[in-house]
């Protein structure tokens, strides 16, 4: 049997719309992500369980894990008779790369079970293709960090999909999911078709400056540049209480705060555990909207998708 865990991720990381993503893992050891197990069988079957299993499609054919199996068999020319089990621990429409978790775990498990017929580049391309069926377009800012780990910059040039960006080990990432759903497709549709020249210049300056600050080890500069002029001004209205949460996080010592992916999850960056705990406590008390919500203090997950057991 093969069992693969794929971690949650932050798409965009405020300054890198569709081109920057980061995998995260809670300090307390919680597996914040999906797991897919595969075992040999006489025929294909898919079973699902987990905290958020009720949010999955009602038919097997609509499930993205089934579609991963189907597409993997097409690409490799092999009809794999396997029993697949999806442990759906990630809320759908959360801004934590939920669909990427399922896709990455499923395809990485299939590839491992089949003897790794696809190299990492081809597998990542396939992950982007399958995740795009849910998000509405192919982009790698969730699947790349989920699969490869760490902070990843999407390049898609010279057959390079993404490359790692050095980040700061002292940074803690407070992740708060309020328990409501935001559709990625709807969150993309709310964005304007055109941006002003000033916003384009600011976006380029923030992203380039952030990458430069990461490579030159300037954490305060990197944090100061984490300002989103592309998505956050338009999406914040989809997140009840976001403006108050961002203001409170800053007052409690957060270096930066932004929307994770399309939301509604937000992240706050701290360089001190005491500040991170204070931010986490405030968010748990004021940002969560129901019992489905949660808050985790995380670090970047450098490992990405990995086999368990």
From Swiss-Prot:
Keywords: Amino-acid biosynthesis, ATP-binding, Cytoplasm, Kinase, Nucleotide-binding, Threonine biosynthesis, Transferase. It is an enzyme of class 2 (transferase). InterPro entries: GHMP_kinase_C_dom (IPR013750), GHMP_kinase_C_sf (IPR036554), GHMP_kinase_N_dom (IPR006204), GHMP_knse_ATP-bd_CS (IPR006203), Homoserine_kinase (IPR000870), Ribosomal_Su5_D2-typ_SF (IPR020568), Ribsml_uS5_D2-typ_fold_subgr (IPR014721). One of its GO terms (molecular function) is homoserine kinase activity. Pathway: Amino-acid biosynthesis; L-threonine biosynthesis; L-threonine from L-aspartate: step 4/5. Gene3D superfamilies: 3.30.230.10, GHMP kinase, C-terminal domain (3.30.70.890). GO terms for biological process: threonine biosynthetic process. GO terms for cellular component: cytoplasm. ATP binds at residues 91-101. It is found in: Cytoplasm. Pfam families: GHMP_kinases_C, GHMP_kinases_N. It catalyses: L-homoserine + ATP = O-phospho-L-homoserine + ADP + H(+). Its EC number is 2.7.1.39. Catalyzes the ATP-dependent phosphorylation of L-homoserine to L-homoserine phosphate. This is Homoserine kinase. It comes from Edwardsiella ictaluri (strain 93-146). The gene is thrB.
């Amino acid at each position: 049997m093969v069992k693969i865990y794929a971690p949650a991720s932050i798409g965009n990381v405020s300054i890198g719309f569709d081109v920057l993503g980061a995998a995260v893992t809670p300090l307390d050891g919680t597996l914040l992500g999906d797991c897919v197990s595969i075992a040999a069988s006489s025929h294909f079957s898919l079973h699902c369980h987990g905290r958020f299993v009720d949010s999955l499609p009602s038919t097997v054919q609509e499930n993205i894990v089934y579609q991963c199996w189907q597409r993997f068999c097409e690409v490799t020319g092999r009809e794999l008779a396997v029993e697949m089990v999806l442990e759906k621990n990630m809320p759908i429409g959360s801004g934590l790369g939920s669909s990427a978790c399922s896709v990455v775990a499923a395809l990485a498990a299939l590839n491992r079970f089949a003897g790794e017929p696809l190299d990492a580049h081809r597998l990542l391309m396939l992950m982007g293709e399958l995740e795009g069926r849910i998000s509405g377009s192919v982009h790698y800012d969730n699947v790349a960090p989920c699969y490869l780990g760490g902070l990843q910059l999407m390049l898609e040039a010279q057959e390079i999909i993404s490359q790692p960006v050095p980040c700061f080990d002292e940074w803690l990432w407070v992740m708060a999911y309020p328990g409501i759903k935001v559709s990625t497709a709807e969150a993309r549709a709310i964005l304007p078709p055109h941006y002003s020249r000033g916003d384009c210049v600011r976006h380029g300056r923030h992203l380039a400056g952030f990458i430069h600050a990461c490579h030159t080890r300037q954490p305060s500069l990197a944090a100061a540049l984490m300002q989103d002029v592309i998505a956050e001004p338009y999406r914040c209205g989809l997140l009840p209480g976001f403006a108050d949460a961002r203001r409170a996080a800053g007052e409690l010592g957060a270096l930066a705060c932004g929307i994770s992916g399309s939301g509604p999850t937000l992240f706050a960056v701290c360089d001190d555990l005491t500040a991170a705990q204070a931010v986490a406590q405030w968010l748990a008390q004021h940002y969560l909207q129901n019992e489905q919500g949660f808050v985790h203090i995380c670090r970047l997950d450098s490992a990405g998708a990995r086999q368990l057991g």
